[in-house]
A protein has these predicted regions:
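Extended, well-ordered alpha-helical scaffold/bundle regions in very large, multi-domain proteins
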Residues: 184-225
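Active-site-proximal helix-loop-helix substrate-binding element of RNase H-like nuclease domains
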Residues: 26-33, 37-178, 185-190
Length: 225
């Protein structure tokens, strides 16, 4: 069984991965998925919709293979938002697969290179800035610091379409690359890499503190010159 995933998050979007998910502002707004190549569905979490118990069961079942472009990002954000501890063994990353074939690293770039029928929507960047990043309070927007679905219903519907399209693109990429599977040994290394990132590493905090101080001192000296 295959589950293709894509989510859209709210946080300071200049951060990503572990740092972004650790933000107090972090939340998942939209959750799009396709089960066994069925039509893509979307769950509007920001508007109060809920993920079904069955899908949550699939997420936590390592025998159900979850696929995503940059699966580490999806897995980490899902873990953070739902309080889960999803293991990398249940995931496959089409970004890793594409990289092994020297394809571009972006979803958009892979779509263009493979000449997919459906490609990533160019409107996505503006929609992400609008809904996923804090906004400047003004008189025109009523002093709000965040744009909600109710503030721009038409944009929100387009945002949902964008999220669905990303899953459709990811499905096409997965299907195009089925003849070039990630070797078992490489998948083992990927899982090891993910476990290390999940756990983190021990560092000498005193050394790090001095390194930061040296960097600041150097920048101050160069600036004065």
């Amino acid at each position: 069984m295959q589950l293709i995933l894509k989510h859209t998050q709210m946080c300071h979007y200049r951060t990503a991965g572990y740092t972004g998910a650790a933000s107090e502002q972090f939340e998942i707004l939209l959750f799009a998925y396709s089960l066994n190549d069925e039509p893509t569905r979307i769950i509007d979490l920001a508007s109060g919709e809920k993920i079904s118990d069955k899908i949550m069961e699939y997420l936590t079942d390592d025998s159900v293979i979850k696929t995503a472009y940059n699966a580490a990002f999806e897995r980490n954000c899902i873990n953070r938002f739902f309080g889960l501890s999803l293991k990398p063994e249940g995931w496959r990353c089409t970004l890793v697969q594409a990289s092994m074939l020297s394809l571009p690293l972006s979803l958009e770039g892979v779509g263009e290179t493979l000449n997919l029928d459906k490609k990533k929507m160019s409107e996505g960047k503006d929609l992400i800035r609008y809904f996923c990043m804090p906004c400047k309070p003004t008189k025109a927007n009523g002093g709000r610091t965040r744009n909600l679905p109710s503030d721009a219903p038409e944009k929100w519907e387009l945002f949902k379409t964008y999220c669905i399209r990303d899953v459709d693109v990811e499905k096409q990429i997965r299907n195009k690359l089925t003849k070039f599977p990630i070797p078992d040994r490489e998948q083992e290394l990927y899982c090891m890499d993910q476990r290390i990132n999940d756990r983190g590493i021990m560092v000498d905090q005193e050394l790090i503190g001095h390194a930061v101080a040296c960097d600041l001192l150097y920048k101050e000296t160069v600036t004065k010159k």
